[in-house]
Amino acid sequence: MSEKTVKVQLVKSLIGTRESHRATVRGLGLRRLNSVSELQDTPAVRGMINKVSYLVKVIG
């Protein structure tokens, strides 16, 4: 059975955000505006997405 995945896209700039939030976005594998990363759907990843929910969008 395949692992469940979640795609996230960076939709807001990191300028003016907290350093810890920038590090979280980098941890999600996102670099530039509108970049997309596909990650395993784990509680840790969900928590990271929740922390920076105002910067990212979950796709599909």
UniProtKB/Swiss-Prot annotation:
Coiled-coil region list: none
Name under which the protein is recorded: Large ribosomal subunit protein uL30
GO cellular component: cytosolic large ribosomal subunit
Quaternary organization: Part of the 50S ribosomal subunit.
Family matches, as PANTHER family: LARGE RIBOSOMAL SUBUNIT PROTEIN UL30M (PTHR15892:SF2), MITOCHONDRIAL RIBOSOMAL PROTEIN L30 (PTHR15892)
This protein's UniProt keywords: Ribonucleoprotein, Ribosomal protein
The organism of origin for this protein: Paraburkholderia phymatum (strain DSM 17167 / CIP 108236 / LMG 21445 / STM815)
Lineage of origin: Bacteria, Pseudomonadati, Pseudomonadota, Betaproteobacteria, Burkholderiales
SUPFAM superfamilies, alphabetized: Ribosomal protein L30p/L7e
GO molecular function: structural constituent of ribosome
Gene Ontology biological process: translation
Protein family membership: Belongs to the universal ribosomal protein uL30 family.
InterPro entries (UniProt xref): Ribo_uL30_ferredoxin-like_sf (IPR036919), Ribosomal_uL30_bac-type (IPR005996), Ribosomal_uL30_ferredoxin-like (IPR016082)
Top-rank taxon: Bacteria
KW Ribonucleoprotein (keyword) present: yes
